[in-house]
Amino acid sequence: MARAKAEIQPVAENRKARHDYFVEETYEAGIVLVGSEVKSCRAGRVNLRDAYAQIKDGEIFLLNCHISPFEQANRFNHEPLRPRKLLMHKSEIHRLYGKVREKGFTLVPLRLYFNQKGKVKVELALAKGKRAYDKRDDIAAREAKREMARALRGRYDD
């Protein structure tokens, strides 16, 4: 019998990114890791909070992504905050480079996950920073939606 396709479970999510940025487009990129980093990812010991991507010499690198050292890897362990190369098509990199050069755009990782083949992937977002009043507007809209749902729920209980 064939195995059922497993849901893609994120190893790490950057929930703060959706709060701090307007996400314009998302891209999927592979990531170059060493063995101890993959094992730490499988254990879920990844933090994307302050991570961002930068394009240097036609290549994309993920910076400030913290992957905790793997305990059993003793002296062959990796450095937790090293820059990690992302794997994307050259045309996508050129398109992103053109967008990032525009004022206000940045590359932010949204989540890190294993695909069906067991490869580690990064969901990368082309994002524009939110201002304080944009964040307040989002909070007000969320509260209004919650109030409407509460009012509707109370109306049908009669």
Curated annotation (Swiss-Prot):
Keywords associated with the record: Cytoplasm, RNA-binding
Keyword RNA-binding among record annotations: yes
Coiled coil ranges: none
InterPro entries in the cross-refs: SmpB, SsrA-bd_prot
Subcellular location: Cytoplasm
Any one Gene Ontology molecular-function term assigned to this protein's record: RNA binding
A Pfam family that the UniProt record links to this protein: SmpB
Reported function: Required for rescue of stalled ribosomes mediated by trans-translation. Binds to transfer-messenger RNA (tmRNA), required for stable association of tmRNA with ribosomes. tmRNA and SmpB together mimic tRNA shape, replacing the anticodon stem-loop with SmpB. tmRNA is encoded by the ssrA gene; the 2 termini fold to resemble tRNA(Ala) and it encodes a 'tag peptide', a short internal open reading frame. During trans-translation Ala-aminoacylated tmRNA acts like a tRNA, entering the A-site of stalled ribosomes, displacing the stalled mRNA.
Entry's family note: Belongs to the SmpB family.
Entry-linked HAMAP family: SmpB (MF_00023)
NCBIfam families found in the cross-reference section: PRK05422.1, smpB
Protein name listed in UniProt: SsrA-binding protein
Organism listed in the record: Symbiobacterium thermophilum (strain DSM 24528 / JCM 14929 / IAM 14863 / T)
